A protein has these predicted regions:
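Signature aromatic-anchored transmembrane alpha helix within multi-pass, membrane-resident enzymes
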Residues: 4, 186, 291-316
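Active-site lumenal/periplasmic loops and adjacent helix-entry segments of GT-C-fold
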Residues: 13-91, 97, 101-110, 114-135, ...
Length: 451
């Protein structure tokens, strides 16, 4: 047991080194903000609906905030340790399923690989409820294979408490593994009365920003990533064929949900994300196959480690590959956000370029999560929340339209935002902006009052 734990610990360290760690990145703009508001309810007095409403159906933010209160560990370290624990639990579950270290090692180095047609990776570079749910689901798969169904049910309930959609995929997968003959023709039953409510034009504009909602727009290689796993899994005996049937069933369900225009409200359920579980189990099986030859394994494994690490470094070139908790940030945008957190009132209301996350050098760090201040809606991440919470659509559209032409804004435009929404601060990346008092400057990047 100590030897196995030591190997799992080493593989977890390897996985974290390859994956990297970036708090506040991408979806963590929501999750970290929600946890921080749970710890300090005074935060985000103007815009908490853009993350709070989704968290009504999950215990994730309560769980992480509760662990901080219980242990008195700083949140940045608590989030890092939860991420490490989630990766460890995923790899431990993979070992329990396959009993082959080669397969577990392959999964460890491929955690950052994109999943076709879904907009996600196997594991994110920050703490995400999907990672915790994935660990629970994989352990439920292991318990199902061992016919320990009560434990599997408890684990799936745990997954549902933090990420209901991942839990649904886990339930489906476990049913196919336990009772393949009895579920291949079973349809999914959901309370879908809300699906047929008419969608607003504002909601459609927000949903249109999510390319993975529209399968007919996918590239050929994305379709290859959807269909090839079925053929690969079919080669791995009874276990592989049961997983293939699971993949086929979920694919049919996903297409039935995503293609008909009348079911457009179902698209935010992201039914193609069942592929995350399929990819994990497929790589686990492939790793075991490659590992039967030591030399073949070395030839595959070492280049994969180097290549996957290099890809992650290049994906966020202006940030350290691992943004360690408690360290001084080197990314100029993150430094500005940290300054905002320490030097502006808690009830401040900010405006930024609505596409600031995609600005070169920003590296997709979320303002709310890192600055801990309210901000007008953006055009990159907030539309995804609008798609899930349609009542936000009109507000998002109004704020988005008000910020149209941001790159040419001057003091008069910012005063217009102040009159319309109450904005009293802006973050600008344009040295040509004049007429504002800007107490923070770092090159062209400035934090300015709107008075």
């Amino acid at each position: 047991m100590p030897k196995k734990a030591g190997i799992l610990l080493a593989l977890t360290v390897l996985a974290m080194v390859v994956l990297g760690y970036h708090p506040g990145l991408e979806d963590d703009a929501y999750y970290l903000a929600a946890i921080k508001q749970r710890l300090n309810p005074a935060l985000f007095p103007h815009d908490s609906d853009f993350f709070r409403l989704q968290f009504q159906a999950t215990l994730f933010d309560r769980l992480i905030a509760g662990s901080v209160r219980l242990t008195h560990i700083r949140l940045e370290w608590a989030a890092f340790l939860w991420q490490f624990a989630a990766v460890f639990a995923i790899l431990a579950a993979c070992w329990r399923i396959s009993r082959q270290w080669a397969g577990v090692a392959l999964v460890a180095v491929l955690l950052s690989i994109p999943v076709s047609g879904t907009g996600i990776s196997l594991v994110d570079q920050h703490l995400h409820p999907r990672a915790l749910a994935t660990a629970c689901v994989l352990w439920a798969v292991a318990m199902t294979l061992e016919r320990r169904f009560v434990f599997a049910g408890v684990l799936l309930a745990g997954a549902a408490s933090v990420h209901a959609i991942m839990a649904a995929f886990g339930i489906s997968c476990c049913l196919f593994l336990a009772f393949p003959e009895g579920v291949q023709g079973v349809a999914m039953l959901l309370p879908l009365g809300w699906v047929f409510d008419p969608a607003s034009e504002a909601w459609r504009r927000a949903a249109a920003t999510r390319s993975f909602y529209f399968p007919l727009r996918w590239e050929w290689y994305e379709w290859l990533g959807v269909l090839a796993p079925v053929a690969i899994l079919w080669m791995f005996g009874r276990f592989g064929r049961r997983l293939a049937w699971f993949a086929i069933f979920q694919f049919v369900v996903a297409i039935a949900m995503m293609l008909p225009p009348g079911l457009e409200r179902l698209r935010p359920l992201e039914p193609m994300r069942y592929l995350q579980l399929v990819y994990l189990l497929m790589f686990l099986l492939l790793g075991g196959l490659v590992g039967k030859s030591v030399w073949r394994w070395v030839v595959v494994f070492i280049p994969l480690c180097v290549g996957m690490t290099y890809a992650q470094v290049q994906m966020y070139p202006s940030s350290p590959h691992i943004e360690w908790p408690g360290t001084v940030p080197s990314n100029s945008w993150v430094k500005a956000f940290v300054w905002v957190r320490g030097n502006t009132p808690v009830d401040s209301y900010f405006a930024l370029d609505p596409e600031y996350m995609a600005v070169p050098g920003e590296d997709f760090h979320g303002f709310r999560a890192l600055a801990e201040r309210s901000a007008l809606a953006d055009n990159l991440k907030d539309p995804g929340m609008v798609a899930r919470v349609p009542r936000l659509a009109d507000r998002w559209l109004a704020e988005s339209e008000a910020q149209r032409g941001w790159k040419g804004f001057q003091a008069a435009d910012f005063l217009r935002l102040k009159r319309a929404f109450g904005v009293d601060w802006v973050v600008v990346n344009n040295a040509a902006v004049t007429g504002l008092e800007c107490p923070y400057r770092d090159g062209d990047l400035r934090v300015c009052r709107v008075e």
